Amino acid sequence: MSPENDIRLEAGRKLFAGAVNFLKSAPALEFLPAPTAPEVAFAGRSNVGKSSLINALTNRNSLARASTTPGRTQELNFFDVGEPLQMRLVDMPGYGFAKAPKDVVKRWKWLINDYLRGRAVLRRSLILIDSRHGIKDVDRDLMKMLDDAAISYRVVLTKSDKIKAVELEKTVKAITEEMRKHPAAFPEIIATSSEKGTGIAELRAAVYDAII
């Protein structure tokens, strides 16, 4: 491991070693907090393990769960990181609309599209993909939205402990190849496990990289 990477990892650790607090939920653009800090958004299909990953990232047991009670699932949830404030995490509503009413789907797409295109402090979006299932068409739809909005994004694999190492390697290779076709995609994939702690230090460093 290089000295430069050691510095990144330590900076990422320090970033999340202090205060992390739920700020607010925003069901529409007029409810967004003032753009006073850089933001990194977490997006992913429903049940991809987003809340668990945010909790592992921030060293909290129920931080994300506190803002995702029933009725808030179609809102953007903001978390302040650091005192004084250094950045904000944005928990985007889970997508994958097989059982969702059409008006809910349309409202979600409007909110996300408007947020991505109009939020000057958004530094990067992290797209969470379940290691067991790989990229789905709904993920590709979001990637196209990010490409069109010229928002840098990076794929983060969740639940990497749930598949064999050889299968994980194949998944990482396949997704890396696909990411090369997307102009706004960061080419390197981060494989994580909220349960085992795998990849969490690198994910913290990646968030730090995005805001400096």
Swiss-Prot record:
TM helices/strands, residue ranges: none
BP GO annotations: division septum assembly
Annotated GO CC locations: cytosol
InterPro entries the UniProt entry points to: G_ENGB_dom (IPR030393), GTP-bd (IPR006073), GTP-bd_ribosome_bio_YsxC (IPR019987), P-loop_NTPase (IPR027417)
Chain ranges of the EngB-type G domain: 36-212
Cofactor(s) this protein cannot do without: Mg(2+)
Molecular function terms from GO: GTP binding; metal ion binding
Binding locations of Mg(2+): 51, 73
Keywords associated with the record: Cell cycle, Cell division, GTP-binding, Magnesium, Metal-binding, Nucleotide-binding, Septation
Gene3D superfamilies registered for this protein in UniProt: P-loop containing nucleotide triphosphate hydrolases
Binding residue positions for GTP: 44-51, 71-75, 91-94, 158-161, 192-194
Classification via NCBIfam families: GTPase_YsxC
HAMAP family xref list: GTPase_EngB
Job of this protein: Necessary for normal cell division and for the maintenance of normal septation.
Family per record: Belongs to the TRAFAC class TrmE-Era-EngA-EngB-Septin-like GTPase superfamily. EngB GTPase family.
Protein name listed in UniProt: GTP-binding protein EngB
Organism of derivation: Zymomonas mobilis subsp. mobilis (strain ATCC 31821 / ZM4 / CP4)
Source species taxonomy: Bacteria, Pseudomonadati, Pseudomonadota, Alphaproteobacteria, Sphingomonadales
Gene behind this protein: engB
